[in-house]
Amino acid sequence: MVLTMASQDVQNFFQPLSSWLSRVYEALQQAGDALSASLVLLSKHDSALSDKPEQDLDAAQIQQTYLEDEEQDHDGSPEEASSLFLEEDHFSLSNSDLQDSVQTASPTLGQQAEDSSSVIPPWPSKIPGAPKPQPVLSSIAEEDHHSERQRCGRQHGSGTLEKVNGRKQVNSFGDDEEPSTSSESDEDVTKQFKISVSRSQSFRSGVSEKGKTTELEQKIKCKRLLCTHQEDSAEGSACEDLDRTSQLSYSEILSYEDRPISILPQSPFESRNVRHHGPCRPEMGMVRSLGRPCADGVLETETAFVSRGFEDSYATHSSSLWSPEEQDGTSLQVPHRLLEPISKCGDLDVIFEYRAVTQKLTVTIVRAQGLPDKDRSGVNSWQVHIVLLPSKKQRGKTNIQRGPNPVFKEKVTFTKLEPRDVASCAVRFRLYAARKMTRERMMGEKLFCLSHLHPEGEMKVTLVLEPRSNLSSGESPLSPSVVSHSDSASSTQSLSHGGVPELLVGLSYNATTGRLSVEMIKGSHFRNLAANRAPDTYGKLFLLNCVGQEMSRCKTSIRRGQPNPVYKETFVFQVALFQLSDVTLMISIYSRRTMKRKEMIGWVALGQNSSGEEEQEHWEEMKESKGQQTCRWHTLLES
């Protein structure tokens, strides 16, 4: 009995305690379940946003999904709570106690569910409205766009690199062009291309009109000349034989024209280049020299003396051209318009007298006139140097004379000159400006071929002094001696009196490989108008298509302080054979100045839109030379 009562007392004592502990456990379990459910929902939502940012979720479906999860969480919490009470082995709870515990725990559960719902529902309610996800999605799209732009930029960069590599391939022998090009250069090229197009159209139309009359006059004059030489011959083929044997003499008579031609019939193209501009008289050929020698002491001539250094033999003697009536005349009157070169330094009056018996040639230098005044040249003292070519062993010079029209009247005699050697010799005249403390400076020169010389008696000639020569090498490449010379006082030979800037260019094209080789050999009369010193110059080459778009570009290295710079740089362009007649080569010479913008000295265009007839003839000669280099001087046009 006592035990029964004691057990009841113990049971009554522990029953409230166990019920309180069970309620506390239930509350903690429910709170933990609600918290875990909310964390699971948050993790699901975050994973859904991170894995599928571009997926368009419907607001109602999202809200329904969250509500179903909430209901499952709320339904699962009481089941778990009831299972806790069923697992109590040591304590038996009455229905009332269980109900009380459930009623006690239900406010806590409701509070926890309310707390969880207060945290979770804002997410689905805010996601459909897209205030926050939109910035996230837009930033991702922007990143994709940015990455795509970066990819495009990398592709564009590779294209630019290929173009740079293309330039390096083009400029295989010279310095490469700078990576960044100024808009001024592009504007200059566009302007020059338009000018060259207009100039090309103008001179081509003029040539087409004069072509027929020139060809007719040439045939008539040639026939008249040949008939004069063959008066005693009755054979029908005499004229043809004379045409072949006296080709040198006939071309020499025509050598006064402005275009350089080749006397020796090396190719059919050169013979086709012989043209007339006036009456076919030997006197004119005498005054106009066969070649225009350069200022460096090496003979550069495209006629009787080729660039190979007098290696070719002369099959004919031009003295047979002179008729008795012409030999009687001692003074030659030459039209002034035929004596005007591209640029002029003055006139030199000389008298030639050759005696075959004594084998002596006496050259009397009478006077010079039309020289630049002191304001333009800086000097007022003059001296003439003469030399007998090709040996250069016999030389002479006059005394120094002053004034704008110095009178010399001095004689120079060349001895041991046999009659058979007269036709293969020439006399070179050079006019120097004499200075006291500095080295003399050459102002102009002229070459007179002795094949025009009278066999007996005196012959008065007025020579037009020119500042620069013009050379055409025909089918033979340029002799190294032409550019390996040592210019006398090259740093002081800038013709401040107004010599025209010129550029010696070599062209060759290989039809098999499609390689167009352009060699910038040397320049002449590059002046620095802004300073009293020789300029620092470099050249730029542009290859343009038929509409003026740039295909390739390159440039030379800088030549510092040289009025007559020697470049000797070759650039190779890849041009297909069918494109050769549609491209234009633009060459521009610039003067580089410190702390100032560059200044263009001049430019020239060759090809489809050549800047002149000389340039067009050079281009055509290159196409017919079959891979051999052809070299010519070109006068630069002002910018």
Swiss-Prot record:
Residues 95-191, 470-496 are annotated as: Disordered. Residues 476-496 have a biased composition (Low complexity). Residues 95-119 have a biased composition (Polar residues). One of its GO terms (molecular function) is phospholipid binding. PROSITE patterns: C2. Residues 142-151 have a biased composition (Basic and acidic residues). Residues 344-463, 499-634 form the C2 domain. Residues 121-134 have a biased composition (Pro residues). CDD domains: C2A_Synaptotagmin-14_16 (cd08389), C2B_Synaptotagmin-14_16 (cd08408). It comes from the Eukaryota. Coiled coil: none annotated. Keywords: Repeat. One of its GO terms (cellular component) is membrane. PANTHER family: SYNAPTOTAGMIN 14, ISOFORM D (PTHR46129), SYNAPTOTAGMIN-16 (PTHR46129:SF4). May be involved in the trafficking and exocytosis of secretory vesicles in non-neuronal tissues. Is Ca(2+)-independent. Homodimer. Can also form heterodimers. Belongs to the synaptotagmin family. This is Synaptotagmin-16. The lineage of its organism: Eukaryota, Metazoa, Chordata, Craniata, Vertebrata.
